[in-house]
Structures are given as C-alpha cells and as structure tokens.
Amino acid sequence: MIADVYIELKEGVADPEGEATLKALRLLGFKRVKKVSTVKVFRIDIEARSREEAEREIAEMCEKLLANPVIQKYSIVWRE
C-alpha cells in the first residue's frame, strides 16, 4: 500500500517560505496568485494487513516524527 502524507502548517501559523514565494511571483508579474502555502509530501510504501492498520501506523508516524502537532496538520491520501 502506498500513501502520500501531506504535512502543512495550521491556519494562523506564519509561513515565511510561502510568503516569500508569493512576493517573488508577484514581482515576476503573476498578479492573480492570491496565496502560496508550503506543503511537504512523504510517499510511504507500507505493508499491512488492512488499510485501517496502515492508516493507524502512518498516523502514529506523523504524530511522533513527521509533523509537529503544535503548528502542523497532516492528511493521508492513498494511491491506487
């Protein structure tokens, strides 16, 4: 089973990289861009007896290592 795990900042947390990218895009003439957010993606290939078991294990990975629960949130998208 393969999952894409998206790690992004929670609402209200400053995103200096996203803000700098937005500013640079506007300076390059891309005036219609409203917002740029930084998102990190981990592609995890995991062996498990069920999708539920794999999802529990990946959630534990996120809570223990991949995401900082104080300022980040995560979502899991399964690849078929």
From Swiss-Prot:
EC no.? Answer: 6.3.5.3
Q: Got any disulfides in this one, which pairs?
A: none
Q: Which domain of life is it from?
A: Archaea
Protein name stated in the entry: Phosphoribosylformylglycinamidine synthase subunit PurS
**Does the record bear Nucleotide-binding in its keywords?**
yes
Q: Which organism is it from?
A: Archaeoglobus fulgidus (strain ATCC 49558 / DSM 4304 / JCM 9628 / NBRC 100126 / VC-16)
Describe the reaction catalysed, as an equation: N(2)-formyl-N(1)-(5-phospho-beta-D-ribosyl)glycinamide + L-glutamine + ATP + H2O = 2-formamido-N(1)-(5-O-phospho-beta-D-ribosyl)acetamidine + L-glutamate + ADP + phosphate + H(+)
At the highest ranks, the source species' classification is: Archaea, Methanobacteriati, Methanobacteriota, Archaeoglobi, Archaeoglobales
Q: Which residues form a coiled coil?
A: none
Q: Which GO terms describe its molecular function?
A: ATP binding; phosphoribosylformylglycinamidine synthase activity
Q: Which family does it belong to?
A: Belongs to the PurS family.
Carries keyword Nuclease?
Answer: no
Q: Which Pfam families match?
A: PurS (PF02700)
